[in-house]
Structures are given as C-alpha cells and as structure tokens.
Amino acid sequence: MKVPSWNPPGDGWLKCNFDGACYPDGKGATGAVIRDHNGTFHGGSAKWYGYCMDALMMEALAFRYAVILVKQRGATRVVFETDCQNLIHLWTMEDEQRSMFATILREIHDLGSSLVSFSLC
C-alpha cells in the first residue's frame, strides 16, 4: 500500500491543503494548512459548522475558506490541494456549472481573481 506524501509547490509559491468533513451528529468542519516549498508552515485554521448537508458541500466550503485564509495572509501565488476528485471535476466544469455548488464555486472564483495565480489539484 502506498503511503500518501506531501508534494511541495514550486519555489516562490505556497500550497494550501484543505479538507472538509461531516460527522455522524450532523455537524461539519473545514480546515486548511498553508506551507511553502520548504514545507515551512505559513498558517492554518479550522472552522466548525452546526450542520453538514453532505461531504462534497463541506469540501466546497473548505475550498472557499482556504481561499479566504490565503488572501488574509497576503499570498499571491497559491496551489490549492484537495483529496476530493468530485470537487476538482466540478471546478473544471466552471462555465457549465448548474449544481447546488455553483454559487460557492463562483464565489471562490471571484475571491481568487485577486491572486496573481492559483490552481486546484
């Protein structure tokens, strides 16, 4: 079994790993960690929600939260990383997006437009 490992961003970039979770009691949480190409910690945070519609919604909220976090830190070149392939798929369909996540994804796009460059992987 292959153990997942963290891959650093390019020199001059930051990487923000984020995740969302739903719990059996119906609550949810999001979190994000920002590191540079050396793995040096540049910030992180977690947010609790009194509700959780579903796991994909929490992943989308985590992405939104991560973009806000890096902007607060003054970052301009950021790679965002998630383990949620469904979110990556929805993000790449941006112009065709009509799901219940469309509003959140558009907000993320608007928030990220002030960054020099960012990507999702």
Regions found by a protein language model. Give the residues of each.
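Primary recognition of RNase H-like, Mg2+-dependent phosphodiesterase/nuclease domains
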Residues: 1-121
